[in-house]
């Protein structure tokens, strides 16, 4: 008779009555799978087994299961942080009108950054350097900088997205302006996203311009929104004042504001004049624009406020591009360039001494310092006890900065 394989010999051996192992009777009582909340249904099973038979069954069952588990994709546990949840949402469904506002705002400012960069590259003729960066605890951004271009001595546009946790003292401080923040929590997850931009042209006849629009949100433990608010604005800082430029800039911004609320422009223009003010110099940084902060549910619902912010940001290109196109190639003297440097020095003073956004960024753990200081000009100057000549163009600018004007 042909030799049997080892598996056949093992089966015959286990089946043979002459094979004697200590046998054990095994009884089990359990409940069948059921959605019923009633008493357990009993079932009793009796198995006569030998140790060798049990080992064979175990090996045959566990080995394929272990192999299958090794092949399977790892099971993803629920994301533990707000940043993880948002990253998962973007992977699974992208960003659309039903997405959380924080993701919609991030998408919008990234799109606007790309549009503005493309238009400024058209005006200047040179390309921006673009740096993508990430924060260790979630978030990141894109910093676009053009230095020593044809039109812009320095131009920077930065998108920043920050996830973090507010400690108890910060919660109590913020709750003064936002009552929907839960004061009982020891810490609260937060999200902040914004687009910041500063353009410093070479030509002293062309004005510096600044823009910032941002969104802040605190979140419940399940990731839903708790408190939210928008902030932002834009403003013009000329070295030489052309009334027609100031009127065009303010008129364009006013139109965006008026489409939502007729009170917005006068209110936010006044706020801008007061905020961008060098207290130690006794003069405004520039000729203003609009500025607002903490726009939350006490003003308008979130959708309407988001729409307002979108319109303001979209108004930037039509408010500034006609001005830079008109002024970028005007002739100027060395003395006029020196005056521009002195005005830039005042700009630097405000940003480093008074600006809350700069202070917030520099004091946020894990922040990107290069992006925060992107707003500073490539060159600036200071002279001891310098005063412009009476009745000069330089003096007229200082007069307006000391007594802000209504342009529209």
Language-model region placement:
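Mature, function-bearing regions of proteins
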Residues: 158, 162-191, 237-241, 281, ...
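Membrane-proximal, acidic/low-complexity disordered segments on the non-cytosolic side
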Residues: 67-98
